Amino acid sequence: MGALPVAHSLALTAAFLPCRRPAAHGRCRRRRYRAVVAYMEPNPNSPAAIAGRLVGALPIVGLVARILNDEGGVGGDIIDFAEFRRRVSKKCTVMDSKAFYDFNQRRGKPGDPFYVLLCCWLAAIGAGLLKTEEILEGVARLRISNDIEFEEETFIDMMRAAKEKRAKLKAPAPQIPMETRAEKALEAIYVCCFGQDMVEDEDEKLLRAILNAVFPSVGRAAVERMVASMAKQVASGERKRDGRTVSKEVQQRQLKDLEFLKQNKLESS
């Protein structure tokens, strides 16, 4: 694959670079964190979480809080894709950003950092609201349609509808471990970015870096285990036998469904 223009290369990685302020003497200080915690995995019973729900429930105060908070999640709101990207960006190191860029170089358009992050967003935020097959069908459509805006809008509508339905039924939200969410993200990334291709050693290395950046609380050992397991299943053909890949015929049918959904959305607007 040919090298991308420098300007485009910077544009791809800029969204994931951490915000850095030069020190007084002009040199950059390395960012340090006391503990690695998943940014979408708060304790719902913590004082901060309870206070957040109370603030979100107040009409005027909640509105102001939502305006001032660019990371979302105020009062239990669903974190949208843009807010999710900002949260990831603030936790990413330069090496994490490079992993996204290198993965894009290897996989081409389907490996676009935004596509990869959409897969992670659907698994991290949509787990418990979206079915696994809904996520995989959506990212398979994205691979051939390249219409990320439509998929984002479609999925956020589905998540909101599922959340409203759960609220009406007064059903508690399922507690899904972050490791399970990371596994779902890996499944989605494979369907979107690989299709049915083999996962090479360099791909495994980059996938580990990406998942560790997005799901830091899962732990490097667990991430390494799930990536190695998936690569082994792909190499042995196990995923095809289990029906966990999307054939070209299904992809074409999904593309037709996508056009139908777009037309319906235009007519209803």
Curated annotation (Swiss-Prot):
Organelle targeting peptide span: 1-37
Function as written in the Swiss-Prot or TrEMBL entry: Nuclear genome-encoded factor required for the accumulation of photosystem I (PSI). Functions as a PSI biogenesis factor. Cooperates with PYG7 to promote the stable assembly of PSI in the thylakoid membrane. May target primarily the PsaC subunit. Does not seem to be required for the expression of chloroplast genes encoding PSI subunits.
GO terms under cellular component: chloroplast thylakoid membrane; stromal side of plastid thylakoid membrane
Membrane-related topology note: Peripheral membrane protein
Record PANTHER family: PHOTOSYSTEM I ASSEMBLY FACTOR PSA3, CHLOROPLASTIC (PTHR36770:SF1)
Locations listed in the record: Plastid, Chloroplast thylakoid membrane
Keyword annotations of the record: Chloroplast, Membrane, Plastid, Thylakoid, Transit peptide
Protein name in UniProt: Photosystem I assembly factor PSA3, chloroplastic
Taxonomic lineage: Eukaryota, Viridiplantae, Streptophyta, Embryophyta, Tracheophyta
Phenotypic effect of disruption: Pale green phenotype.
Source species: Zea mays (Maize)
Gene Ontology biological process terms from the UniProt entry: photosystem I assembly
